[in-house]
Amino acid sequence: MNVVPILLLILDGYGLAPDSTGNAAKLAFTPNIDRMLAMSGGTQIHASGRAVGLPDGYMGNSEVGHLNIGAGRVVYQQMTRIDVAIENKELDSNPILLDLFTKVKSSNGRLHLLGLLSNGGVHSHIRHLEALLSIAKEHNIQVILHPFMDGRDTGPKDGLKFMKEIVSFLTSTSSGVIGSFCGRFYAMDRDKRWERIKLAWDAIVHGVGLHVEDSVKALEQAYASGETDEFIKPRVMGNSSVNCVQDNDAVLFFNFRADRARELVSAFILPDFNGFDRGRVPHLSGIATMTMYDKEFNIPVLFNHENITKTLGEVVSALGLLQLRIAETEKYAHVTYFFSGGREEVFTGEERILVQSPRDVATYDLKPEMSVMEVTDRLLTAWNSKKFSLIVCNLANPDMVGHTGNIKASISALEAVDNCVGRIEKAVAEQHGCFILTADHGNVEEMLDKSGQPQTAHSCNPVPLIAIYDGKPLNLKESGKLGDIAPTILSIWDVSIPNEMTGNNLLSSE
């Protein structure tokens, strides 16, 4: 073990992209960062899409970025986790799903699938629903679908194409029928507006609502009368309540995001529920949810929360070394909670420094330097104490000012950051330590869209990874990802990489 002190500096929202009028990173005068980017040995790493556990083409973000960096592996987000389980057929043998099928068969009941009909990828995805329908069909399960129309994470009338798709799928595969449908305004409230949930409940359980024969035509008629997806009033298929949730039936909620599914689930399972008068409450043979909605529910979950162990922070602590996490308020949770794999408690030997972000401005383009000077001052004091083997620091400016869409202010932010980067690099070299410069995702390098309009969102661009040890750049391999940083740090120390840390060591022997 050769534990040289390492300072990991994360420039939040600093991606790499070609020169353009919207690339504030190229427009700014940043001699220190530019010099490091030009060094031989540095590399670009992926910070978006599947490389960080998100769906292909999805931009990275600070939470996911720090989670991957700290975990030293690809941490699949819920949607991608389910996608992967479908691709490798793990969903087909999911024990909770199979147990639900068993309960349905033993009770001679039906399985009701409830969730958002959408490809928005925020609460659900239609491909997850279609996979569930296919698997249920293979097990000869009678399925009744109660879709909720989106209109928030998709266009206000995009629901028609999703309804056509799912009707076509149900028809071609003979995998089920639609029992009712309504807008998410009713079925997915999260503010205890129980009068909305009651309308969805009454349609799903009691068959109360506007009765229709054709879901596609009914949706078209709703549009014609001024309703849009989010606000589609509950419709019940057919003239009776035969396809409503009955005794001995089972229910599966297929949303993977919890917050807007909890209220309707609670109406099904809580004996002391008092949100509204439920009327007849069906005695279910089983109920399950795609992910953990609430620990208090105590019901089966197809994809439980992953317990991320052997993170970089945990390994450093187990080695008996001291570590420091430091950031200003806007990014403090990222270098602590997310970097530690979703752990709030400090590790033994871990210290934290929180620097207050400016409160005297409404938006950070009015103060683009934010608190970077104080963060740097306190960081250098800690570094020069020679107390810590690992310091993790986040500089928030590129991301937070980039989000304002103000290119001029973003240039000022980057120039303030560059000054601090130069100071930090010099201090690390003086202590013969290792300085690692990277970012969690892109933003400030792509501030205009293709039409020249302001773009305030993150990007899918790669980010830099530069390691300078004792004043000299280390040679790093290409085609890495954020999850490779932690294994690389352990390799610099010549420490064995735990099996849980499945990222790659990017140190090159060349």
Swiss-Prot record:
Binds 2 manganese ions per subunit. Mn(2+) 1 binds at D399, H403, H458. GO terms for biological process: glucose catabolic process; glycolytic process. Mn(2+) 2 binds at D12, S62, D440, H441. Keywords: Glycolysis, Isomerase, Manganese, Metal-binding. Its cofactor is Mn(2+). This is 2,3-bisphosphoglycerate-independent phosphoglycerate mutase. The gene is gpmI.
